[in-house]
Amino acid sequence: MEIEKNAKIPFCENTLINAVLSEYRTKAEQEGLEFSARIQMPKELACDEAEFCVMLSNLLENSLDAAKSYIAISIKHLNHQLSLNVKNDYEGELKKSAENNYLTTKPQGSGLGLKSVEAILKSNSGFLKIEDTDGVFDVFATLKN
């Protein structure tokens, strides 16, 4: 059996999450960005799979819009908990509201991506930590699985 030269190895056994990651890998490569992923998760999720994919898509979309040269993602499953980490480098200044919330820099963006991530995590007793240091935007989220 011959393997196609440009064939992509799946990220994980979960079909829906693999599809999301594959889509964003393709988009990142089309933008000339390095896309790295370390995924260690079960095939089946105990948490709402659709909500997890919405959260993942929103974080990756934000990274894709802002990344200067790379996007790095890590998903781990340990002790009935999923942890998700999305990082990208960026140039320029980030905008924040008076309440210290991040604001969209997209000309036609709604700014609802992070808000929907926060809402999903809140409804699932999750945790969100966002840091921006030395030109790196780093989002870390955990939720029960």
Question: Each PLM stretch: what is its role?
Answer:
Residues 1, 13-31, 82:
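Short beta-to-alpha transition helix within the HATPase_c
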Residues 9, 35-55, 105:
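Conserved short strand/loop->alpha-helix "switch" segment adjacent to the catalytic nucleotide/phosphoryl-transfer site
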Residues 49-71:
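Conserved ATP-binding N-box helix of the HATPase_c
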Residues 70-80:
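Short beta-strand/loop element within the Bergerat-fold HATPase_c
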Residues 82-111:
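Glycine-rich/acidic phosphate-handling loop/turn and adjacent ATP-lid/helix
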Residues 113-117:
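Short alpha-helical Gxxx[C/S/T] motif in the catalytic ATP-binding
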Residues 124-135:
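Glycine-rich ATP-binding loops of the HATPase_c
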